[in-house]
């Protein structure tokens, strides 16, 4: 039997269990750096096949790792499992985690024959928390020849387009006042925030086609009859590479500045 067929046979034997893992994660979402139940659940699932799991790891309470094999180039399979506020696993981290764990478990008895090592690396807080960056700084990717994971989407794509992303928080500070009794004494921080969104909309017409810019108002005030003295928004700026993001004219960052 070929290695590929052996892998498929291993995967088929755990297919039902993997679906159960994905469904459990979907029904039990946890935010970044707070994935206590999820990380424990995943670690226990992996331990049912191999008990050599390091948990926690990388100075992160909800990170874990396990390496199959002792010799050969190291392949890291990323396991993401944090969810989004309000909308849970809308980004499909339950699928990402299940796919990587399934691949790692199915390969555990084949690594020597393949001549590789395979590491399952649980990476918390990928929705803005930078869990992989922290683990990278702690040496979790040291000696890795490559790092892989899948991401759910409407199409199967083996070589997708990747983008650079920068995240910004934009704050405006004004002066509060009663909007009906003494509006002339206020300095409306929400007006400034709205103007920023107008600027961003006009900039989109001239931006390089591959650039993307999207934001939301996180704090816009608390009562209609109070002129807001403080507002904040969060933005994601994306492009095909760093130079295109920062140095094209106009760039997404120009709209914010």
List each model region and its residues.
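Proline-centered helix-kink/hinge sites
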Residues: 29-32, 124, 228, 250-252
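Short loop segments at secondary-structure junctions
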Residues: 69-72, 175, 241
